């Protein structure tokens, strides 16, 4: 059987990619794909233990990776973290959470926690990444 090359069809060498929620699931897949294409990947996550494990694994695999601990539901802290890690060329917003309970059993605090991450956090993180790219005169991708 012919072995297919793993070389990406494009290069992101020299690009900086921020992946929010990149310690598991789709976010981790995106982080690895960006790193395979040559990007320096910065992963933002709220759980330091998971973040440290992922960054260590990526660096062991030969990728350039950094981690920053921030909670996307804390809008001001998240914005400050994004401004700290500039410049950015690529932003992947993959943070998300779910509460697994029937709608009739969901209380307002549970609902608000999900919306703070999945809606408010996603919106304001994207806006902060766009502002960082504008401030640095970079044309990026969100």
What are these regions (language model features)?
Residues 102-103, 107-112:
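Substrate-binding pocket helix/loop in short-chain dehydrogenase/reductase
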Residues 15, 63-64, 87-88, 133-142:
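Active-site loop of short-chain dehydrogenase/reductase
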Residues 1-16:
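Flexible N-terminal pre-Rossmann segment of NAD(P)-dependent oxidoreductases
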Residues 126-127:
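A short, exposed helix-loop element centered on a Lys and neighboring polar residues
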Residues 16, 23-25:
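Conserved glycine-rich cofactor-binding loop
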Residues 39-53:
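Conserved glycine-rich Rossmann-like NAD(P)H-binding loop of the short-chain dehydrogenase/reductase
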Residues 49, 69-80, 108:
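The beta1-alpha1 cofactor-binding region of Rossmann-like NAD(H)/NADP(H)-dependent oxidoreductases
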